[in-house]
Amino acid sequence: KWCFRVCYRGICYRRCR
């Protein structure tokens, strides 16, 4: 598992997979 930051339309959040 690993996490990375996702930013879209000024909103950033962390996604883990």
UniProtKB/Swiss-Prot annotation:
Keyword S-adenosyl-L-methionine attached: no
Chief location of this protein within or outside the cell: secreted
Keyword annotations: Amidation, Antibiotic, Antimicrobial, Disulfide bond, Secreted
Keyword Disulfide bond: yes
Tissue specificity note: Hemocytes.
Subcellular location: Secreted
S-S pairs: C3-C16, C7-C12
Entry GO CC: extracellular region
Superkingdom of origin: Eukaryota
An example Gene Ontology biological process: defense response to bacterium
Location of Arginine amide modifications: R17
Family note: Belongs to the tachyplesin/polyphemusin family.
Protein's job: Significantly inhibits the growth of Gram-negative and Gram-positive bacteria.
Protein name listed in UniProt: Tachyplesin-1
Organism: Tachypleus gigas
Taxonomic lineage: Eukaryota, Metazoa, Ecdysozoa, Arthropoda, Chelicerata
